[in-house]
Swiss-Prot record:
Protein's UniProt name: Probable RNA-binding protein PA4753
PROSITE patterns: CRM
Assigned keywords, A-Z: RNA-binding
PANTHER family for the chain: RNA-BINDING PROTEIN YHBY
Ranges for domain CRM: 1-97
Residues of the signal peptide: none
GO terms, molecular function: RNA binding
InterPro entries: RNA-binding_CRM, RNA-binding_domain, RNA-binding_YhbY, YhbY-like_sf
Organism: Pseudomonas aeruginosa (strain ATCC 15692 / DSM 22644 / CIP 104116 / JCM 14847 / LMG 12228 / 1C / PRS 101 / PAO1)
């Protein structure tokens, strides 16, 4: 699902207030990282991810793989931080960052 510019704008404003819920280090996308990514996307829909890799090309490749494996959309990537979104068909209004910060 491709995000519209209006959605990206809204998600960026919400993402500004978020802290990273997932940190991907040198080991890349391990089973544990993928399991936590699935849990975070199911709970929060919009999450901030920190990529602890030095090289820009490595971060970009890892981010592309992360989005492909989780079937999510990249909203924004700045430096070592990325904002990732995947719609949950039945979001929990208390956990979903989209529902919680909709008024921002």
């Amino acid at each position: 699902m491709a995000l519209t510019q209006e959605q990206k704008k809204q998600f960026k404003s919400i993402g500004h207030h978020l802290k990273p819920v997932l940190i991907v280090a040198e080991n890349g996308l391990t089973e544990g990282v993928l399991a936590e990514l699935e849990r975070a996307l199911n709970d929060h829909e919009l999450i901030k991810v920190k990529l602890a890799l030095a090289e820009r090309d490595d971060r970009r490749a890892l981010l592309d793989e992360l989005c492909a494996q989780s079937r999510s959309d990249l909203v924004q990537s700045i430096g070592k931080m990325a904002l990732v979104y995947r719609k949950n068909p039945k979001p929990n209004k208390n956990l979903s960052n989209i529902s919680r910060f909709a008024g921002i």
